[in-house]
């Protein structure tokens, strides 16, 4: 026994001599105890701070610039620094500022020990080289070998995992999380170490994931059951979503006494934390919040038993990175400690808590999307007087699908044959503008004020003095982009008469219209009805009271000429409108009278001839008898 103690004492002395060979920090400044290890995917630096100190990490780039380290999925940096626990910095070999030199990964980290007032107590630079050149630990003032092997994942704090807590996908769920179990017994007084949830990639077609569910003790929710979001109400779908199922309850599928995360393809994830889990980890449920958006993204729902977060994948501090054909979305849920201040000190009974949430999606999947495109509002129109560009054209038929060109004029029409006229507003895209026709008329020349004239529309309505009234056509809403910019009407072909001789003027007819653009304002509208009151109100805009302004008048590209089917010019016996006369019956009457007169004349002539011949014969006979 004495020999064994002597051997142990000699070993301790040898170890002390070995430690004495290492460099010491400057006098009066405590050294930093740190170590690092190399894993399969990254490197990990562990620093043991003195009580009351916090550790801050900074990475150094190849030019010597220092950058403070935070949890960053883009740079593959993770930091964990909890009270009375080692400060851990993890970096992936593909992370930011990791340099490749001769087959080794080099990362320079600047370590600072911070006092409670924010000042730096001591700072030290550490160079991490993986794979390590040897198995010697980097040393500060004391050599502290690792007590446990480092995990290969970048999350270094101690945590407990159970494969039974993993649940497969619910509605649109791509991957699920390994949830933390209740913390084990504390090794000493004070707050317990932080518990960090580990994220595992869970393939959809993994056979042992189907049917996995929460332990029965986690489903003993006393009150305030929160319905779980699932695609169907079946037990299998509920359990695969990581929720509890009880057919005897009013809400058969509900969240259990744990932390449940559901990632949805439509752009958000749901995080539910139970009161029982908060008690197990010695935290206050009301103090749980998102780490990067504590005020902007509060819980969507709070009850006495649960806190529910509805987090968009693109907001609330959620980070995203692309690795191969996968998208990684990450966020963190933390809990602030509840501090009680007394007259001579402050205490807390809360532990620290940090839950890393990660949703993994396949970037190569084809998913349906629904997009709503909202056109920007049109600018407010400016109403003022100005020139209008109008066009009057004649259609080939009643469909108004094609129109005559300038080279087609003059057009030839039979009397009473319809002429299809369209007036439209050019170079205007304001849908609220309304084209209004005031007066439309016809003249025998290209001069709009030449006499004679015949009205087609009076105050926008068909002229009532015509037995063949102009027909104003309604426009189909679907056939024109700006329906209110068009006006159409149909005219029966006619010809002008010589007022003196009452004979048809064999000439051309030109069409004209006066128009304006109306813009509604306030309760007033631009719609008009063809009534006597409207005609009186708008009478002043017609050409009867004067010559209309040139900018308001539009004419047809060319004239329209009429053609009589019998190629003869009728002479009319009756007075009235040339359009009320029909030359065909009058012609037959004249011809009939001429025929009768001719027959009578011939009969009279023949009778008289025979009478004179009889008298001559009687005269000759009497003469012969006298001789």
Curated annotation (Swiss-Prot):
PROSITE patterns: P_TREFOIL_1 (PS00025), P_TREFOIL_2 (PS51448), ZP_2 (PS51034). Residues 1-20 form the signal peptide. Keywords: Cell membrane, Cleavage on pair of basic residues, Disulfide bond, Extracellular matrix, Fertilization, Glycoprotein, Membrane, Pyrrolidone carboxylic acid, Secreted, Signal, Transmembrane, Transmembrane helix. GO terms for molecular function: acrosin binding; structural constituent of egg coat. It is a single-pass type I membrane protein. Disulfide bonds join 219-244, 228-243, 238-253, 440-461. One of its GO terms (cellular component) is plasma membrane. Residues 262-533 form the ZP domain. The chain crosses the membrane at residues 586-606. The keyword Ribosomal protein does not apply. Gene3D superfamilies: Zona pellucida, ZP-C domain, Zona pellucida, ZP-N domain. InterPro entries: P_trefoil_CS (IPR017957), P_trefoil_dom (IPR000519), P_trefoil_dom_sf (IPR044913), Zona_Pellucida_Domain_gp (IPR051148), ZP-C (IPR055355), ZP-C_dom (IPR042235), ZP-N (IPR055356), ZP1/4_Ig-like (IPR054554). Component of the zona pellucida, an extracellular matrix surrounding oocytes which mediates sperm binding, induction of the acrosome reaction and prevents post-fertilization polyspermy. The zona pellucida is composed of 3 to 4 glycoproteins, ZP1, ZP2, ZP3, and ZP4. ZP1 ensures the structural integrity of the zona pellucida. Polymers of ZP2 and ZP3 organized into long filaments cross-linked by ZP1 homodimers. Interacts with ZP3. Belongs to the ZP domain family. ZPB subfamily. This is Zona pellucida sperm-binding protein 1. It comes from Oryctolagus cuniculus (Rabbit). The lineage of its organism: Eukaryota, Metazoa, Chordata, Craniata, Vertebrata.
